Regions:
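Conserved helicase RecA-like core
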Residues: 1-216
């Protein structure tokens, strides 16, 4: 948003750039930033006249569609992610009926020595539903997903970082790149479909030599 403001105020010109880098394209898509990125792309030279690099952890149909729009004769490079889990994280699994999952989550939040906990769900609607339930029941909770305006999202992230709220609910894409000290627990309310997403999730705890707990 700030870059667009500078361009529109004639403080910055993008029409002569040679390189355009679009990082975390899937996250930009999930967080609702693509309209802003499209405006920036329109300010830059045509794709045939610039070199564009686009990075993404996942390549959904929507991400590939963006690549077709923005890249000229692209070369694809795929890197296999490391799938090892952190030995400092204790991993637990509870077999429970779907109808009992929320009750079990409440027991975990009550009984575990939680400093901060990140709860992951696969879809934005699941994040919203879980957030509404926990907030209704009096928990100090924030959520991170693409449906939230950026200013509110940053405010919620600050509340989690400074400990004002000790529960964060997030999707995989929205939670990527979030590094918060003092996360003692990670809860997979819904298990991810990809193993590397699982590794990434539980990597939010057990950092810098500390012990962590992952519960699925």
């Amino acid at each position: 948003g700030r870059l667009i403001d500078f361009v529109e105020q004639k403080e910055v010109w993008l029409d002569q750039i040679e390189f355009l880098v679009i990082d975390e394209a899937d996250r930009l898509l999930d967080m609702g930033f693509i309209p802003s990125v499209k405006r920036i792309v329109r300010f830059s030279p045509r794709k045939e006249q610039r070199q564009t690099l686009m990075f993404s952890a996942t390549f959904s149909y929507d991400v590939l569609n963006l690549a077709q729009q923005w890249l000229f004769e692209p070369v694809t490079v795929e890197i296999e992610p490391e799938k090892k889990t952190n030995a400092d994280v204790e991993q637990r699994v509870y077999m429970v009926a779907k109808a009992d999952k929320y009750k079990l989550l409440q027991e975990i939040l009550r009984d575990e020595p939680i400093e901060k906990v990140m709860i992951f769900a696969n879809r934005r609607d699941q994040v919203r539903k879980l957030y509404d339930h926990l907030k209704r029941d009096g928990y100090k909770v924030v959520m991170l997903s693409g449906e939230i305006a950026q200013d509110k999202r940053l405010k919620m992230l600050d509340q989690f970082k400074n400990g004002k709220h000790n529960i964060m609910i997030a999707t995989d894409v929205a939670g990527r790149g979030i590094h918060v000290d003092g996360v003692s627990h990670v809860v997979n309310f819904t298990l991810p479909e990809q193993s590397d997403d699982y590794v990434h999730r539980i990597g939010r705890t057990g950092r810098a030599g500390t012990r962590g707990v992952s519960i699925s």
